[in-house]
Amino acid sequence: MSDPIGVIHGRFQMLHLGHMEYLLAGKARCERLIIGISNPDATVTRFSSASPHRSLEEANPLTYFERYEMIRGSLLESGVSREEFDIVPFPVNCPELLFNYVPQKAKFYMTLYDQWSLEKKAMLEGLGCVVEVMWQRTDADRLTSGTEVRERIRSGQPWAHLVPPFVYQYMAQQGIDRRFREKA
């Protein structure tokens, strides 16, 4: 039996195929999936010693809206009905704000890769959330990373094979790939 509501979160600072595996695994576990975009803006982005690069400006080049559009378009492209998911801000670094965006009584789905993942899991459990770990892997087991995709775009290397088709098209149509290269 699936959960009525599930919550999943990430920065999605380049929605890639690893993210899609994560999102679709979460959706398979619930009737309605709420996708939280962490670091939605600079006002709620904080430093964490467990993952210092996540708070850097160069690690957060996409706006909340751009990430929202890429997630929405890619899920629709994957056959998920629009009625089955919502996308909201998820200020993970300001836990006191989380329940303004997501229901505390939902099931929170996570994957564990590193110390930062473990810290977030402990934080959510400390807030009284029920957390389900979908899988635990090492960084070496990742399909790809947002960092890798961003670096490939900036350096002119092939990257379309690392992202959903919608993301590749959206990046080109909006000139985001060009913006990345110009800032390199």
Where do the model's predicted regions map?
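Nucleotidyltransferase catalytic core that binds NTPs
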Residues: 1-184
